[in-house]
Every structure is written in structure tokens, then in C-alpha cells.
């Protein structure tokens, strides 16, 4: 079976950071696109709860929903194309006529805008910037790369 790939643009804030969400604690934070795209970072530590997880588990639900909508629209278009070809051949003999209406696309949600309630934090251990809420900063955050704490 062939594999397909789609590309989505995840919105960045004015500082070039993208909003992420931990799969475990559901805490949100922001990480630079450069850090996120670095192939050396296969796993990240959640800056909020400190638990490690695979990089691709930190997408926000809004981004995952948009990806699902894009994939659904593509699948519906492909199914329609295949059935249309089948019906054309079926309708040639004139005894039975079949038709099919093109399915409506699932509306692709506009990409959300990250909340603007984050505070820029510099983590000296790995020399990176992240954003977390003031509350998370007050109780301490973890470095997403090495897991070290910033209290």
C-alpha cells in the first residue's frame, strides 16, 4: 500500500515558538520550532510535569483535529473517484442507471491562535527558550531536552 504525506502549518507566536500539550498532564507550553525540528531530539520532557515522551505526542488537540479533517477529505475524494469510475462502466449497458453525488468536505477548522498567557523562560542547561505560564514558572519547570529543573 502506498503511503501519503500531508503538510500542515502549525502557527507560531511572535517569538517563533509553537504551542505544545503534554499527553500526560495536559499542560501547555511553547517551544521553539528550531528545537522541535532538531533531529537529535527524539524524546522530550514535559516542562510542566517532567515526564518524557516521544516528540510526536506533544501536538495540541487542535492541530490533530485539523490533520484528521484533511485526511478525511482526502479519503472521501479518493472513494468518490473510485466509485465514479465503477458507475461509469456499470451505466454503459443502459439497463440500470446509478449515480453518485460528490460527498461534502468536512470543513477544515482554521488553525487556532495560541493563547498569549505565557512567560518567556531561558533554560541555561541546554541554552534554549521556552514559554510557560507564570504559575508553572513559580512552581518550577523542566527542560524539555535534558529534563533538568529550573526552580
What residue ranges belong to the model's regions?
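N-terminal alpha-helical interaction blocks
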Residues: 1-11, 68-103
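Short Cys/His-rich Zn2+-coordinating modules
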Residues: 1-11, 24-34, 99-110, 122-130
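Short cysteine-rich clusters marking metal-coordination/redox-active sites
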Residues: 22-25, 46-49, 121-127, 143-146
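Short, non-ligating residues that shape and space the ligands of small metal-coordination modules
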Residues: 29-32, 55-56, 129-135, 149-151
Amino acid at each position: 500500500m502506498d503511503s501519503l504525506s500531508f503538510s500542515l502549518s502549525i502557527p507560531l507566536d511572535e517569538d517563533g515558538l509553537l504551542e505544545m500539550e503534554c499527553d500526560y498532564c495536559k499542560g501547555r507550553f511553547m517551544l521553539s520550532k528550531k528545537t522541535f525540528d532538531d533531529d537529535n531530539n527524539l524524546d522530550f520532557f514535559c516542562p510542566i510535569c517532567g515526564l518524557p515522551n516521544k516528540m510526536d505526542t506533544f501536538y495540541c488537540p487542535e492541530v490533530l483535529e485539523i490533520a484528521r479533517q484533511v485526511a478525511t477529505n482526502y479519503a472521501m475524494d479518493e472513494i468518490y473517484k473510485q466509485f465514479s469510475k465503477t458507475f461509469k462502466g456499470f451505466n454503459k449497458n443502459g439497463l440500470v442507471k446509478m449515480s453518485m453525488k460528490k460527498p461534502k468536505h468536512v470543513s477544515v477548522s482554521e488553525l487556532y491562535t495560541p493563547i498569549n498567557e505565557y512567560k518567556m523562560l531561558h533554560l541555561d542547561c541546554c541554552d534554549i527558550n521556552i514559554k510557560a505560564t507564570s504559575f508553572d514558572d513559580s512552581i518550577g519547570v523542566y527542560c524539555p531536552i535534558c529534563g533538568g529543573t529550573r526552580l
